[in-house]
Amino acid sequence: MRIRPIAAAAAVTLLAGLGTAVTTTSSQAVPGAAATTAAKAAKYEVTATVSRTEPEQGEKITIRGTVAPGEKGAEVVLQKRYGTTGKWTKADTDTLNGKGKFKFSEKVDSVRFRQYRVLKPADDKAKSGKSKKLGVTVFGWRALTSLDPVAVTATSEVGSVGINGNTYEQSIVATPVNSGSIAYNVTRGCKSFQGHAGLKDTSPLTATGDIKILTDTTQAYANSFGVTQSAPVSLDLTGVFRITVEWTSHNTAGTEEDQSGALVALGTPRVLCSF
């Protein structure tokens, strides 16, 4: 009969021990652990756009966007690199406004391809985040004669030439023969061509000259000039690999074999390129 009280006491002791164990395990939980884990897993989302992807040298571009979650006064960093494999460097900083927005402006001063991205550094609220890369190709005007010609026939590059009473620097002029040409590769890296066509002022009044400009194999321009005549030339070079200038002289004072005299000239020819 005494065995029952002993067994009952043992059962009470065992239950008490289990209760203690359960209580002890529950008390080891850290308040806010789930919230901390969630915060560490969060990442800033940065979106950005650029105002122009093909600006001209010296122009200003604007990069703007948002950060989520965004807090007013939080700092964001504009990073830049040249090419696609260069090192990212800090270009500027800005602080978010009350709507989580930022804005950067930069004057592009060199003719080369570059990439931008915007970085939101990490803090106790979220991991760092960055925008997608924004590619910008800067174009600049350069003299056509700054390129090496790939083919030349009876044509010269000169420091200056007089056409219809005006002087043009870095120009192209025919030599006193019947015809000639000069060609340059622009390797699909240029968008526009500008120049001024006519005859060199020392050409005889009896001469007239024809000029043609080819973009690859397409005739993009053609005209004829006498002395005191000239005209501006503007061409689209998008996708063009080679530009060729061809000319022919005609002279009423010449012979059937010799029609030289018209010194066809292209004043200050220049191209808008990304190189």
What function would you assign to each model-found segment?
Residues 2-140:
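Low-complexity, Ser/Thr/Pro-rich intrinsically disordered linker/stalk segments at domain junctions
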Residues 132-275:
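Gly-Asp-aromatic-enriched flexible segments
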